[in-house]
């Protein structure tokens, strides 16, 4: 299965995977409004391939069922919580 990957102009780290190049018909208009003007990144064959940030099987299933897959960036790390956990761990030792 080939798909086209586009990056968002409004949300850094967001990518949209669609089956056919420049065919955004399956993507809800509200999502397209939040995504901004899509910028083509690449066309890729998903068969037998690994993707850096997402499970390729989830992408293929979403494209087959919904016509698209939206990849969002991971949530930012809460540095305060990390500090508290590290501090508590040091105090226990």
Swiss-Prot record:
Residues 1-84 form the YcgL domain. InterPro entries: YcgL-like_sf, YcgL_dom. Pfam families: YcgL. Gene3D superfamilies: YcgL domain. It comes from the Bacteria. HAMAP family: UPF0745 (MF_01866). PANTHER family: PROTEIN YCGL. This is YcgL domain-containing protein VFMJ11_1829.
């Amino acid at each position: 299965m080939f798909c086209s990957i586009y990056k968002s102009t409004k949300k850094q780290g967001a990518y949209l995977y669609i089956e056919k190049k420049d065919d955004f018909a399956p993507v809800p208009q509200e999502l397209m409004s939040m995504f901004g003007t899509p910028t083509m990144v690449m066309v890729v064959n998903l068969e037998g391939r690994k993707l850096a940030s997402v499970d390729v099987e989830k992408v293929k299933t979403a494209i087959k069922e919904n016509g698209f897959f939206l990849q969002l960036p991971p949530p930012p790390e809460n540095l305060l919580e990390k500090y508290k956990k590290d501090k508590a761990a040091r105090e226990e030792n």
